[in-house]
């Protein structure tokens, strides 16, 4: 939905978020990205969108640096996640759109990227940052707190003593946003206004909860490769 830019100062065990900006993606670019995700990915389309999104990100990073009267020397490195196209830790692969080399050339700043694939190569599920950050917070406040993060997909972090467990629990806003866009001409359910007018379909919920992923033991992660419109429509047919 947007390009999020956080400018933070990190010294030893101290993390201070100084500035944060959110730049909305225009509808045309979002549609192109979704087409690449869901349809056959021709190399030409992928290259064009890859370049377009990278140059757009570079532009917004430059805007934020200028906005807060910083210099490029103030930025030691840019952490870049890109936009996930395909996430299959079961196949030991995770691909994203966005070119870290081009981004580094445009900004003339060191760019650190490929967090997901590097984590998978190290035996993880390809989502290392949330768990590390939550573990950091627990050490600072000296309490064991469980974190549930509801983004496109939901992930949970549980810390106990020196052990931290983090994994995806299942879908969250992704399916809701998809439904709002297709059937209500809305980007998302603002303030839960649509949901508040309805009632829980217990039979549909029971059908969805039979999904094998929910019974799978951690470590595990998921994405739109499993939880997508076809998945929802399949369960609707079962209970109709």
Annotate the PLM regions.
Residues 2-17, 22-23, 165-240:
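Conserved ATP-utilizing enzyme core subdomain
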Residues 37, 61, 65-68, 107, ...:
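Structural signal for hydrophobic packing residues in well-ordered secondary-structure cores
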Residues 44-100:
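Short beta-strand-loop/turn "lid" adjacent to the catalytic site in phosphate-handling enzymes
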Residues 89-94, 105, 109-187:
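Phosphate-binding/catalytic loop of phosphoryl-transfer enzymes
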Residues 56-59, 63, 102, 132-136, ...:
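Alpha-helical scaffold segments in soluble metabolic enzymes
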Residues 6-60, 64, 68:
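Glycine-rich nucleotide/cofactor/substrate-binding loop typically near the N-terminus or early
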Residues 14, 39-44, 66-74, 88-91, ...:
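Short, glycine- and charge-enriched coil/turn segments that flank and shape catalytic ligand pockets
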Residues 23, 27, 43, 47, ...:
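Electropositive phosphate-/nucleotide-binding environments in soluble metabolic enzymes
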């Amino acid at each position: 939905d947007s390009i999020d830019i956080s400018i933070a100062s990190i010294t030893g065990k101290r993390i201070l978020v100084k500035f944060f900006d959110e730049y909305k993606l225009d509808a045309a670019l979002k549609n192109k990205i979704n087409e690449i995700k869901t349809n056959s990915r021709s190399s030409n389309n992928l290259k064009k969108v890859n370049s377009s999104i990278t140059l757009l990100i570079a532009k917004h990073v430059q805007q934020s640096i200028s906005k807060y009267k910083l210099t490029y020397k103030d930025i030691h490195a840019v952490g870049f996640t890109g936009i996930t196209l395909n996430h299959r830790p079961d196949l030991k692969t995770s691909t994203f759109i966005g070119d870290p080399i081009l981004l580094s050339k445009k900004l003339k700043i060191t760019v650190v990227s490929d967090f997901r694939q590097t984590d998978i190569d190290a035996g993880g599920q390809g989502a290392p940052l949330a768990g590390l950050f939550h573990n950091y917070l627990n050490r600072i406040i000296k309490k064991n707190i469980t974190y549930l993060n509801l983004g496109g997909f939901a992930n949970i972090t549980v810390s106990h003593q020196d052990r931290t467990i983090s994994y995806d629990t299942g879908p969250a806003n992704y399916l809701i946003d998809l439904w709002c866009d297709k059937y209500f001409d809305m980007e998302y359910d603002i303030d839960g206004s649509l949901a508040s007018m309805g009632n829980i379909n217990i039979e549909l919920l029971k059908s969805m909860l039979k999904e094998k992923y929910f019974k799978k033991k951690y470590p595990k992660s998921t994405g739109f490769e499993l939880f997508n419109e076809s998945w929802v429509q399949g369960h609707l047919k079962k209970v109709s």
